[in-house]
Amino acid sequence: MLITASAFAAVLPMFSYLLIIWWVDRYEREPFRLVLKNYLWGAIGAIIFAAAWSSIVSAFISIFIKETTQLQKLETIVVAPFVEEITKGAFLLFTIRSNKFDNITDGIVYGGAIGLGFGMTENFLYFILYGNTLVNWITIVIIRTLFSAVMHCVATATFGAFLAYSKYKKTLVKISSIFTGFLVAMFIHLAWNFSVSFESTTLLGFLFMIFTIVIFMLTFSISIISEKKIIYKELLGEAENGLIPYTHLSILNSSIRNKFGWVDESIRKSYINAVTTLAFRKRQLKNSSGNSKSYYEEDINYYRNFIQNLLSNTENK
């Protein structure tokens, strides 16, 4: 019964958070298959590697620190944030190679997915190991669902945002951005673990996490608003060149695009996806070089032709 309840308490909230983050990214929503892959890395891969490396690092530290309480505090406050942020963030270095990973919003979504997966598995383990009474179990479920697991989401999403920012930058800026992102993610993790390790700082820890979550939500919102502006700006030239109607500009970057009547319903979804992708490909082209530049140029030509044919076929009906 405990294991079943713990599984539900661990999986349902985290997967719900994942769906919310994925849904909020409404202008260029990431393929859910890829988001889920990152989530599962956090839930399985990152957990396994974190456990292995934490054991190795802790064994090394125990050579110098013999006192059990001090060693446990050090493992919680320093070793866990360092090792876990590396194992969670490492997968993003593979995800960023995807052409789907192209802006800060994407970094937040993919990084957040990994953090939520990690938090889900960690929650389950905590629920079954430390929920020895009903009151303890409920308390742990509430705290970890609202704070600890969300901390993993925010920390790795932060690293993902820095990673996305660095993607089209020159080498020096790229390296410094990635390193800074890792340090910020580790600081968030370390600050939370430190605060809940001592009774006198627990309240401060909750306040810190509330503040951090608010900043995370604001950053996510600003990134979404930025995408809205990119869509309008990049499609303005397409309207001037006659590819799309001017009247569509203010529709394509708003919720009105999900309503009926402004374009032939048989092509609405395909049209929205195509013009939105075109807008972001144009922005990516400006920041790219080498093989990536050639890829985006080809993609832009493809989507322009696709949109032209789509609208022409509708007019000829």
Please provide the spans of the model-predicted regions:
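Hydrophobic alpha-helical segments at protein termini of multi-pass membrane proteins
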Residues: M1-K317
